[in-house]
């Protein structure tokens, strides 16, 4: 299985600027790299406002052209979706396209497509102290793997593994779809309701924006509270942290507890002595609440492996556009070596 796709014509140059696009289930963020890791002209567009990726890219390129900027010939896109061939269909939206056809339609020499959390993993080395908040103490081992997990529209999972001779390889996978194991009574309520309506309950079903709505609906039904229309994720978080609504607070408690448990599972699988990084669009807004929650207790509640996990530092990524440096790295590697460093 391929972990990235690079559609290209015979390149006649590898010059800047280069186009970067981080495509989530809700938003697509475009940027222009004008020199190595010099990234600017960031624009966020709603996925739902454009019929296709090509249309959204044209919208951004038209704005560049109108400003007099030089148009890029090389591009990299991160997708909230597995990338296993030329044809891509987003998991949490209806965009579907051919990478090669999109490259040709836009007149690009190169178009690299990778998973969005793989690009975020590639970008971890470029995060500075101001881009992170440490929520668990620990001592990171520089030569060890780093784990990455993050809830947003879906649940992204990746990691960064040091490679022999220097550098690192980002892992491409779909770890957000692993089985979910509830522990507390409220978690079981949410799990049973989700199982009844959807069948198999993956981690993403509850650890995502849609998961917040699902958890709240399940707790509401259990308590006999009438909810005519399911709350949106934004309504749940506002209810918990601005209005102190009891059901919304219970929803967030379930969410943070499950996240601690799943993050620890990912760390154990990866041997993430280099640390655990929490990304995605939800957590950066609620770092104090996450720190005050059961997350840390659940992270180490793994029986005989408690001592192992207790050594691992955990960080929340708070940078505004943390995946863009990883996309720049993937594109540079492709232009220099034919493919990004992805395993």
From Swiss-Prot:
Annotated coiled-coil segments of the chain: none
GO biological process: glycolytic process
InterPro entries per the UniProt record, alphabetical: ATPase_NBD, Bacterial_glucokinase, Glucokinase
CDD domains: ASKHA_NBD_GLK
Gene3D superfamilies registered for this protein in UniProt: 3.30.420.40, 3.40.367.20
Gene Ontology CC annotations of this record: cytosol
Transmembrane region(s): none
Localization annotation: Cytoplasm
UniProt: ATP binding residues: 21-26
NCBIfam families the UniProt entry points to: glk, PRK00292.1-3
Name of protein: Glucokinase
